[in-house]
């Protein structure tokens, strides 16, 4: 089983992915077919067959996933903070690395939060980890807004850097807790609807946070004017407290998912924890998912550079409010991709949607780089092409990389699996923040000034095409019933390799899981029929 995801022949590598498509496509399948297939995949004899999306089924997935709105808002608000600090302290900024430290320390904190809370989510408390992340997000956002002071300017920078680190930890903590919980509750929705709601409640929330974080400073600049930037940046980031504070009370009413209650490893002692079995079972697919996430975040940095190019061409030396107005326009391009990519993931599967989106994005990126000089002369066309390009980024990896991470892992280790993949992605973003400026500086004095942006974009676009190939040829199939199947396969693997599965969950639940899964494989429920009147 340690090589279960590896292609075992050239023909399997070349054509095996075609066979996997059938399990992922829902196009042309009736609701009855989807329900029947899902029933044959469920591991709980007493579980209710859900035939429609209801509000009481949606709110747990929303309450857990919507916390990522705050992550998008607070994370993106730092760009407003840095912009204001450069205006307020121009001399001090040039004499220190304060701005770089404030920007970079967030990556470190986020990685710490993703890895640390991934472990907490699986081994200590999944809901408890989410609540702790929620409280941290509220507190450290508030500290960044009102608790950042210093006797000297450099002391103020140091204070803000410290709070920014812990805010990064809180942001990172949301990924392996709230996203994982959202995926488990979304899995309780009817087949054919699960992927879209997970993506809407996670990635679309992050993108909405980006848009709002661009809009709020635009409004505040009219209220405070450019003479009061100190108040502006503190209010802008402080408003990020409101969403997690409101969600906190919704989350208090939540319970862990039924699958986590049955399959968690909280009761397994450290010395008995099957570390090596888990590594052998998941090493390959985790490597592929993490690599795709690394490339996506790594490339996103260079793609963002085009914002500066377009703004500089349209409104050179423009006032702050105009620059921030255009930032709203660019951030709005995320929304269509996030909305449509989620729907596509339910029809053709997250794996193929990711490959399609990132592949088209790579092609458009290469074309934009090749035609950069002429595009700069037609700004309206440039904005439209760039918008389409950005939309496909969210349509593909933006919506589906988290979906892949959550559906290619078993419930018992999903927090750690998701946290590791997300952390490697964030490391990719950090590497991009250092690599691409170095590449740009190398071509700064070149006879062809366009190379300064073309070369990084060629590199990123090529990596996009590479990640599309990884998704098509090496990612496992991810159907509507992927979580059910993965839980069964993982428990069966542990049992076959000598691990006492009675330590999973709350005792006897796991025996029921195995018994029901085995009976499904033997076809004991082939006589199941869906009552058409209930559909």
From Swiss-Prot:
Gene null: resulting phenotype: Triple deletion of GIT2, GIT3 and GIT4 impairs the uptake of glycerophosphocholine (GroPCho) and reduces virulence in a mouse model of blood stream infection.
Sorted UniProt keywords: Cell membrane, Glycoprotein, Membrane, Transmembrane, Transmembrane helix, Transport, Virulence
PANTHER family associated with the record: CARBOXYLIC ACID TRANSPORTER PROTEIN HOMOLOG (PTHR23508:SF10)
Membrane topology of the entry: Multi-pass membrane protein
Catalytic activity, as annotated: sn-glycerol 3-phosphocholine(out) = sn-glycerol 3-phosphocholine(in)
Gene source species: Candida albicans (strain SC5314 / ATCC MYA-2876) (Yeast)
One cellular component term from this protein's GO annotations in UniProt: plasma membrane
Family: Belongs to the major facilitator superfamily. Sugar transporter (TC 2.A.1.1) family.
Segments passing through the bilayer: 49-69, 101-121, 137-157, 165-185, 204-224, 232-252, 275-295, 324-344, 352-372, 378-398, 419-439, 455-475
GO molecular function term, any single one: glycerophosphodiester transmembrane transporter activity
Cell location: Cell membrane
Conditions for induction: Expression is positively regulated by the transcription factor PHO4.
UniProt xrefs under SUPFAM superfamilies: MFS general substrate transporter
Protein name, entry field: Major glycerophosphoinositol permease GIT3
Pfam families on file: Sugar_tr
Functional summary from the UniProt entry: Glycerophosphodiester transporter that mediates uptake of glycerophosphocholine (GroPCho) with GIT4. GIT3 acts as the major GroPCho permease. Does not possess detectable glycerophosphoinositol (GroPIns) transport activity. The expanded ability to utilize GroPIns and GroPCho results from the organism's pathogenic nature and its need to occupy a variety of environments within its host organism. This possibility is buttressed by the fact that GroPIns and GroPCho are present and abundant in human fluids.
GO biological process: carboxylic acid transport; glycerophosphodiester transmembrane transport
Gene3D superfamilies: MFS general substrate transporter like domains
């Amino acid at each position: 089983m340690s090589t279960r995801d590896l292609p075992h022949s050239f023909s399997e590598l070349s054509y095996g992915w075609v066979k996997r498509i059938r399990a992922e496509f829902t196009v042309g399948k009736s609701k009855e077919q989807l329900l029947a297939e899902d029933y044959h995949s469920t591991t709980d004899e007493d579980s209710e067959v859900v035939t429609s999306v209801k509000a009481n089924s949606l709110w747990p997935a929303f309450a857990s996933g919507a916390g990522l709105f705050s992550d998008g808002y607070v994370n993106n608000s730092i760009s407003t903070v840095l912009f204001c600090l450069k205006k307020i302290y121009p001399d001090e900024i040039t004499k220190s690395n304060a701005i770089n430290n404030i920007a970079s320390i967030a990556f470190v904190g986020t990685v710490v939060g993703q890895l640390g809370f991934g472990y907490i989510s699986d081994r200590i408390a999944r809901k408890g980890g989410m609540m702790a992340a929620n409280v941290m997000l509220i507190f450290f956002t508030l500290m960044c807004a009102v608790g950042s002071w210093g006797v000297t300017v450099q002391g103020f920078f140091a204070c803000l850097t410290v709070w920014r680190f812990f805010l990064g930890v809180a942001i990172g903590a949301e990924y392996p807790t709230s996203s994982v919980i959202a995926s488990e509750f979304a899995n309780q929705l009817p087949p054919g609807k699960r992927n879209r709601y997970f993506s809407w409640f996670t990635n679309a929330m992050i993108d909405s946070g980006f848009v709002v974080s661009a809009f709020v400073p635009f409004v505040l600049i009219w209220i405070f004017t450019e003479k009061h930037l100190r108040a502006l940046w503190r209010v802008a980031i402080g408003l990020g407290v409101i969403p997690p504070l409101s969600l906190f009370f919704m989350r208090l009413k939540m319970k862990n998912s039924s699958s986590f209650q049955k399959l968690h490893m909280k009761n397994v002692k450290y010395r008995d924890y099957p570390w090596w079995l888990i590594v052998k079972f998941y090493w390959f697919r985790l490597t592929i998912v993490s690599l795709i996430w690394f490339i996506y975040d790594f490339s996103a940095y260079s793609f963002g550079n085009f914002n500066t190019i377009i703004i500089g061409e349209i409104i050179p030396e423009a006032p702050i409010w105009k620059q921030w107005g255009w930032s709203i326009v660019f951030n709005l391009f995320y929304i269509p991709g996030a909305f449509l990519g989620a729907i596509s993931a339910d029809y053709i599967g997250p794996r193929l949607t990711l490959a399609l989106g990132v592949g088209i994005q790579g092609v458009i990126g290469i074309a934009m780089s090749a035609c950069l000089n002429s595009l700069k002369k037609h700004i309206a066309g440039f904005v439209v092409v760039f918008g389409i390009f950005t939309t496909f980024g969210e349509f593909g990896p933006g919506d589906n990389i988290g979906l892949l991470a959550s559906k290619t892992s078993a419930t018992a280790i999903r927090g750690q699996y998701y946290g590791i993949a997300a952390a490697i992605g964030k490391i990719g973003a950090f590497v991009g923040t250092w690599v691409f400026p170095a590449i740009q500086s190398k071509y700064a004095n070149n006879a062809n000034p366009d190379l300064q942006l073309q070369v990084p974009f060629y590199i990123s676009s090529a990596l996009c095409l590479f990640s599309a190939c990884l998704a098509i040829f090496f990612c496992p199939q991810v159907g509507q019933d992927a979580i059910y199947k993965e839980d069964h396969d993982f428990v069966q693997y542990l049992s076959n390799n000598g691990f006492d599965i009675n330590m999973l969950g709350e005792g006897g639940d796991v025996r029921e899981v195995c018994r029901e899964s085995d009976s499904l494989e033997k076809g004991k429920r082939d006589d199941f029929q869906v009552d058409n009147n209930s559909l």
